[in-house]
UniProtKB/Swiss-Prot annotation:
It comes from Synechococcus sp. (strain JA-3-3Ab). The lineage of its organism: Bacteria, Bacillati, Cyanobacteriota, Cyanophyceae, Synechococcales. It is found in: Cell inner membrane. Keywords: Cell inner membrane, Cell membrane, Membrane, Transmembrane, Transmembrane helix. GO terms for cellular component: plasma membrane. The chain crosses the membrane at residues 1-21, 385-405. Belongs to the UPF0754 family. It comes from the Bacteria. This is UPF0754 membrane protein CYA_0973.
Length: 406
């Protein structure tokens, strides 16, 4: 009997200390929900952590944002993630994905439609507005127009074949005998006939003076006009024979072939260039936006986009330039981030709302999952607390036995 007095207290202290700590640790998480009897909530239900999970979530978020994810740490993390090599690799990957997308006919069609809408908006909307704004400047297109005049129009000369074709077109389409006859009739008005007769009388000399003052040109010109009006077919035949007799096609061909702006005086060339520039500028100011918009509406932009994408898909220069393009873009981003990364991170942190994200994530975690996660992290530490409780209980029992021995 005396033996039980010395054995029971240490064993009882061991059992009580061990299981008391084990129960206390389990009561941190369990029960997971509240239990009620006749509407009265049983104390210690739910467990401490499930009962205070919202406050715990806010405290965890506050601790993480205050100690771990500070703006300085996020800034340093962003600099590590956005190193030039990583950005270049990411940009190269994106460009590779874009090129691979062009190889797929269905995706190429979708890309062509998107590109067509972009080109149409650029040409039909943005470009007319840009021309309208730029046209207000006095020097609008002055350099390109002058360059066009100096390098193209000033050097332009027709070769023999071009001059021959142009002369044939002029004589057959622009100035056939019928048109010449009508122009001659329109020119020979009474006023013009009087002016020609007076000019001939004043300027004629020698034998021509005698003819001019005795006969004059008035009657002859009146008869010519009357003949052209009353006998149009005969007048046209005479004009046609006259053109053949003077070999008009050959003469006109020679004139056109020798025609060049370089043969004109310098002052005339400058005046012509100025007039051309002013005419183009005035036309673009008044009609340019409408002309560009109308031209854009007449273009099949989807077809143009398909041609552009097809050319890009088979472009060896583009494929060979991917590395260089990605490197250049990465350097541009690096320079931008070096200057504005800190301010950018200060703007991003409130937008990300990381503390609320962390709190919502903790609140969304079930008590069982939360217990399992904590147990995985501190399982050994929690078991050590349980064992320590048993050890302390055993020691208390031993102390009690010592008191009994005294």
């Amino acid at each position: 009997m005396a033996l039980w007095i010395y054995v029971v207290p240490p064993l009882a202290g061991l059992v009580i200390g061990y299981f008391t700590n084990d129960i206390a640790i389990k009561m941190l998480f369990r029960p997971y929900r509240a239990y009620r009897i006749f509407g009265w909530r049983i104390p210690f239900t739910p467990g401490l952590i499930p009962q205070n999970q919202p406050r715990l979530a806010k405290q965890i978020a506050k601790t993480i944002m205050g100690s771990l994810l500070t703006p300085e740490e996020l800034h340093n993390l962003a600099r590590k993630l956005l190193r030039t090599e990583r950005m270049q690799a990411g940009i190269r990957w994106l460009l590779g994905v874009a090129l691979d997308r062009l190889q797929n006919p269905e995706q190429q069609q979708q890309t062509a439609q998107v590109l067509a809408r972009i080109l149409a908006d650029l040409f039909n909307e943005s470009l007319p507005r840009l021309v309208k704004v730029l046209a207000r400047q006095e020097t609008f297109l002055e350099g390109p127009i002058n360059q066009l005049f100096d390098q193209v129009l000033l050097e332009l000369r027709l070769n023999a074949e071009q001059a021959r074709q142009l002369s044939e077109w002029i004589l057959k389409q622009a100035l056939p005998p019928k048109v010449l006859r009508q122009n001659l009739v329109d020119f020979l008005t009474d006023r013009n006939i009087e002016a020609l007769d007076e000019e001939f009388r004043e300027r004629a000399t020698g034998s021509y003076w005698l003819v001019a003052n005795l006969f004059g040109l008035k009657n002859a010109l009146l008869r010519l006009r009357t003949y052209c009006l009353e006998e149009p077919e005969g007048a046209e035949a005479i004009l046609e024979d006259l053109l053949k007799d003077i070999n008009a096609p050959r003469r006109l061909t020679e004139i056109l072939q020798n025609l060049s702006l370089q043969n004109l005086p310098v002052s005339a060339v400058r005046q012509l260039r100025r007039a051309l520039r002013d005419g183009i500028q005035d036309y673009l100011r008044s009609q340019g936006p409408e002309v560009i918009k109308g031209l854009g509406e007449s273009i099949d932009w989807e077809k143009v986009a398909s041609l552009v994408l097809g050319r890009l898909r088979n472009s060896k220069a583009l494929i060979a330039s991917i590395d260089q393009i990605s490197a250049d873009l990465a350097l541009i981003l690096e320079r931008y981030l070096e200057r504005d990364l800190e301010s950018l991170m200060m703007q991003v942190i409130p937008v990300l709302n990381l503390d609320q994200v962390i709190a919502d994530k903790v609140n969304a975690t079930s008590p069982a999952e939360l217990e399992q996660a904590i147990q995985q992290i501190v399982r050994q530490e929690l078991q050590a607390i349980v064992n320590l409780g048993g050890l302390l209980g055993f020691l208390v029992g031993c102390v009690q036995v010592l008191f009994l021995l005294r």
